[in-house]
Structure formats: C-alpha cells, structure tokens
Amino acid sequence: MLAPKKQRFRKAHKGRVVSKAKAGTTLAFGSFGLKSIDSWRVTARQIEAGRKAATRCMKRQGRLWIRIFPDVPVSKKPAEVRMGKGKGSPEFFAVRVAPGRIMFEIAGVEENIAIRALELASTKLPVRTRIVRRYE
C-alpha cells in the first residue's frame, strides 16, 4: 500500500477541503481519466482497491497512473477507551481530494475497456467521480 517514506510530523489535524483543486485538474499522461466531483478523504486502501479493480478489468494491458498519494496520517483511538488523554496513534494514511482532481489515468487500451476499468475503480472510492477523455 502507498505510504510516505518520511514524515515531518507524526500526527496531523483532521482538516477540510474547502476549495476546488488548483493543480492536477487536467490529464497529464493517459487518454482517459477519473476526476473527482466531491471533496473527501481517500485512504491508501481505497486507492489500492481501485488500482486492483482497474488493472484486473484491463487484463494487464495498457498503462495505469495513480495521480494522488496518501500523505496525511489519520489517527484513531482504540476501542472502548474514554475520551480525553490525548490524541490516538496514527492508524493509516489518506489524501484529501478536492473537486476537480484527476485521481487515475489510463492509456494503451480501447475506449470501452478504459471506461469500464475507470467505472470499476470509481466504485471503490468514497467520492463521486466523472470520466474525462483527452481531445487532441
């Protein structure tokens, strides 16, 4: 699963995504992409599940790019622990996805296969998405 090699800080604030994405809003590598419509927190496990679903649908043909990286540590308290006594320990990593952000890109496969693969990947993600294509 995706996780940063080094971190500057062990724990992070919860945070919110309040504005639209400023960078990563256009296709950079592939001819088809999966663009977010909502703002939400996507975990490393959800990204990996989307990647597996898309590559399985593509039958290992073509190329898939993941344009988001989980760099925010999410902490959690253990079960049946009272409130207070500090913040919980980091459990997993996530990325805050803003509306308009390209999350996955595909190239090297037919259009119907690429669209089907991106639809499968979008079912694994907690954000509403739209499939975009490159027009030359």
From Swiss-Prot:
Q: Which PROSITE patterns match?
A: RIBOSOMAL_L16_1, RIBOSOMAL_L16_2
A Gene Ontology biological process in which this protein takes part is: translation
Q: Name one GO molecular function term.
A: structural constituent of ribosome
Key words of the record = Ribonucleoprotein, Ribosomal protein, RNA-binding, rRNA-binding, tRNA-binding
Q: Which GO terms describe its cellular component?
A: cytosolic large ribosomal subunit
Report whether tRNA-binding shows up as a keyword of the record.
yes
Show the coiled coil region(s): none
Q: Does the keyword Ribonucleoprotein apply?
A: yes
Family according to the record = Belongs to the universal ribosomal protein uL16 family.
**PANTHER family recorded for this chain?**
50S/60S RIBOSOMAL PROTEIN L16 (PTHR12220), LARGE RIBOSOMAL SUBUNIT PROTEIN UL16M (PTHR12220:SF13)
Q: What is the documented function of this protein?
A: Binds 23S rRNA and is also seen to make contacts with the A and possibly P site tRNAs.
Record's subunit section: Part of the 50S ribosomal subunit.
This chain's protein is named: Large ribosomal subunit protein uL16
Species name: Rickettsia canadensis (strain McKiel)
Protein's gene? rplP
